[in-house]
Amino acid sequence: MAAKEVKFGNEARSKMLEGVNILADAVKVTLGPKGRNVVLDKSFGAPTITKDGVSVAREIELEDKFMNMGAQMVKEVASKANDAAGDGTTTATVLAQAIVNEGLKAVAAGMNPMDLKRGIDKAVVAAVAELQALSQPCADNNAIAQVGTISANSDEKVGKLIAEAMDKVGRDGVITVEDGQGLDDELAVVEGMQFDRGYLSPYFVNKPETGAVELDDPFILLVDKKVSNIREMLPVLEGVAKAGKPLIIVAEDVEGEALATLVVNTMRGIVKVAAVKAPGFGDRRKAMLQDIAILTGGTVISEEVGMELEKATLEDLGRAKRIVITKENTTIIDGVGDASLIESRVAQIRQQIEETSSDYDREKLQERVAKLAGGVAVIKVGAATEVEMKEKKARVDDALHATRAAVEEGVVAGGGVALVRVAAKLAGLRGDNEDQNVGIKVALRAMEAPLRQIVINAGEEASVIANAVKNGEGNFGYNAYTEQYGDMLAMGILDPTKVTRSALQFASSIAGLMITTECMISELPKKDAPAMPDMGGMGGMGMM
């Protein structure tokens, strides 16, 4: 086992504090509408320019092991805030730095660290309750646009785009962010259910000008196996031909004789048919076939439940108003499934989202909910260069998370004002002893830090503006973008309650642990063994 270095008391805490301050100072320059960018060097490709707190925090690794421990703990604050609300990472870092700095001063002055932590925890619990009391529901598209604008660094176009996307696909719809082709941002909305499988043969195409298959009022046959024998399908094909409707087959695969016969039937105009592979793989494919069945009012023909393709009837087939199949995608528009069954399926998938621990699974389940419940919107981010594209994409992503958080828990006045108002309301809060009272004061003083940092980044005098805001009431605050005082809600400066709450809770949690640290242990750097000496020439080997 490697030898360890051990530091105690003030020596340990001062090293830890240095690390905290290095990381927090790098992150906090990005806060507010006039926050600056940070350039991150990459071992390959061009440097990345970002204004996203958590991206900056993740890049920081310090050489000194003890300083690095402090930095890594604050990095955890930013990471947790990002996971919980998707935004507010810089605010969380600024709060953590303020609590640690004030708290360690109190410890150095002889206060009991455990009582300080209890005081901080007490203040945070009370502050969260006050924040929720101040919170207002994010009712309309205008409020959603304002939240998105603030989170995207005062970019109004981004805010409006997100509000428009939410309006079109609903609050539960999936909104994804992708690289655009041009300089402008675009919004593409896919109505109905779309999955990433295209037609199995180009001979199915009936709209040559668009290269797509478009079928109106079709039957939908869902099969959970490979289909290669046409005899199995004859009863269904005959029934569909008599009904005079088109047919789309969604199966694990359609190949050989079966595919050839379908193509011939289509080209001769006997039956309009198209075949596509079922989306997903394994268990996910089975689940998605079931989703399509519920959406279209059909039944999945599966041998696992004792159903055979030869015995399938028209009653087993799903229906939809229209289906469009391109080379890459299939879109089912207006399935005729029972609304109550669709709702219960959505509720079931939501339950799975709550229970899953995998981010990948959660994302896929959310996509399934959106496909059943509304649709999918894609925001295509435009930029002149790849570096700008990455930076802008990160901002749009943040704004998207912030708007979702706002819809979930409502909004409070932005610009650090909500925390200042909460601190003022809790001025009379008391702990069980004097040390706890100091802990409460540490937390309440730290709640002013985000406002002060926003003002500092705007190049103004923090103390003057902080006092002016503290002397005001309600939503009165300072708009650093326009350099004016006024009602923050009226000026459209809103923060999601969830983002502010998460930032405060995670910051106080980690900062409290750091204040109560008394000893730090780190591995000593390994000393390299000295190199072998040069052998030189071997003696005594003269010529005979």
From Swiss-Prot:
Keywords (A to Z) from UniProt: ATP-binding, Chaperone, Cytoplasm, Isomerase, Nucleotide-binding
PROSITE patterns with a match to the protein in the record: CHAPERONINS_CPN60
Gene3D superfamilies xrefs: GroEL (3.50.7.10), GroEL-like equatorial domain (1.10.560.10), TCP-1-like chaperonin intermediate domain (3.30.260.10)
Positions contributing to ATP binding: T30, L31, G32, P33, K51, D87, G88, T89, T90, T91, G415, D495
CDD domains, per database record: GroEL
Main location: cytoplasm
GO molecular function: ATP binding; ATP-dependent protein folding chaperone; isomerase activity; unfolded protein binding
EC number: 5.6.1.7
GO process terms (BP): protein refolding
A Pfam match: Cpn60_TCP1
An annotated GO cellular component: cytoplasm
Annotated localization: Cytoplasm
Catalytic activity: ATP + H2O + a folded polypeptide = ADP + phosphate + an unfolded polypeptide
Domain of life: Bacteria
Function description: Together with its co-chaperonin GroES, plays an essential role in assisting protein folding. The GroEL-GroES system forms a nano-cage that allows encapsulation of the non-native substrate proteins and provides a physical environment optimized to promote and accelerate protein folding.
Entry's family note: Belongs to the chaperonin (HSP60) family.
Subunit structure: Forms a cylinder of 14 subunits composed of two heptameric rings stacked back-to-back. Interacts with the co-chaperonin GroES.
Protein's recorded name: Chaperonin GroEL
Gene: groEL
